[in-house]
């Protein structure tokens, strides 16, 4: 089965349209299209494996464009960088976990150049699907403070889909007020050739994050945020972050629909925690529909002029 067909089989029709786009399928050069990691015969996908790898990054490095990396059950203590179109699929959020014990800066903000440590980095490519796994930042969270920024899944000038994943514990317990700690981040650096990002974020659980659950920033970024459960840390106060569940900001555009967004609250009222924050976004309230908001200080916030003291780094 070709890489395109595997991606179509793994993600929803909405996401597949984004993944495939106008690209022409690339020819396989080595006869290996399905790269497996720690896969055993107990996994129903085992018969489709063309090879086996000890780590996710090893399999990703070996995969050609539009091929598949299927990850077996287990906990993988690594950061992963993807730079070509492929499917990265786990055995389910309860079975496959990417949980590094330590993270280092592996990229930077396209806008400011600030260093970022991403657990899963999708950098400068299209057609990348991440599905059926957990990204857990807890083990590395106490090993550094507010710099570099800390991100669970970062689509940096990249397009594709994140579906049926759990992004959790991207949070600094010893420095909870850090503003650069995000569950999922999609960025385009003000757009331009090779910089646009178009990502479908579908049916995920994003929880226990530092600042924002899902963030999309800058012109050239479009996100479809649908059927996710985004849960903040509840009441936070002085020295902590005023959290936002979903942020569409700085010229980014997005459709936010059918999500459950809860537990964002900040005291004192100098700053506001928002379930959904549109900050100088390319689209307004018309781009949000059918969401369920529970226990947020403010369910939907909009800001259109000047800097906001309640927005993460850009």
Task: State where each predicted segment sits.
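Extracellular beta-strand-rich solenoid/capping regions of secreted or surface-exposed proteins
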Residues: 57, 61-65, 76-89, 97-132, ...
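Bacterial N-terminal signal peptides that target proteins for export
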Residues: 1-11
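Extracellular beta-strand scaffolds
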Residues: 76-78, 88, 94-95, 127, ...
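Bacterial N-terminal signal peptides
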Residues: 10-21
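Parallel beta-helix/beta-solenoid
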Residues: 64, 83-84, 93, 124-125, ...
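Right-handed parallel beta-helix/beta-solenoid
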Residues: 24-58, 62, 73, 91
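Extracellular beta-strand/beta-solenoid scaffold signature
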Residues: 102-121, 143-154, 175-193, 208-217, ...
């Amino acid at each position: 089965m070709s890489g395109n067909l595997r991606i179509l089989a793994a993600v929803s029709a909405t996401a597949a349209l984004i993944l495939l786009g106008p690209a022409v399928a690339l020819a396989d050069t080595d006869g290996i299209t399905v790269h497996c990691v720690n896969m055993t015969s107990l996994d129903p996908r085992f018969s489709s494996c063309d090879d086996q790898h000890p780590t996710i990054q090893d399999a990703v490095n070996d995969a050609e464009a539009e091929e598949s990396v299927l990850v077996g059950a287990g906990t993988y203590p690594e950061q992963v960088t993807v730079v070509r179109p492929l499917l990265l699929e786990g055995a389910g959020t309860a079975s496959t976990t990417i949980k590094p014990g330590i993270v280092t800066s592996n990229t930077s903000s396209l806008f400011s150049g600030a260093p970022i440590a991403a657990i899963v980095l999708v950098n400068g490519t299209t057609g990348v699907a991440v599905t059926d796994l957990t990204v857990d930042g807890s083990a590395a969270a106490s090993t550094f403070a507010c710099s570099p920024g800390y991100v669970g899944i970062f689509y940096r000038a990249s397009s594709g889909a994140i579906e049926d994943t759990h992004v959790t514990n991207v949070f600094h317990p010893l420095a909870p007020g850090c503003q650069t700690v995000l569950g999922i981040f999609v960025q385009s650096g003000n757009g331009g050739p090779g910089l646009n990002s178009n990502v479908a974020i579908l049916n995920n659980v994003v929880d226990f994050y530092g600042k924002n659950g899902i963030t999309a920033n800058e012109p050239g970024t479009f996100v479809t945020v649908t059927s996710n459960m985004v849960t903040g840390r509840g009441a936070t106060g002085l020295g902590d972050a005023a959290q936002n569940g979903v942020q569409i900001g700085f010229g980014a555009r997005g459709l936010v629909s059918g999500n459950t967004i809860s537990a964002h609250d900040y005291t004192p009222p100098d700053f506001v925690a928002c379930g959904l924050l549109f900050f100088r976004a390319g689209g307004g309230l018309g781009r949000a529909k059918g969401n369920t908001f529970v226990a947020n200080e403010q369910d939907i916030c909009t800001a259109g002029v000047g800097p906001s003291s309640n927005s993460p780094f850009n």
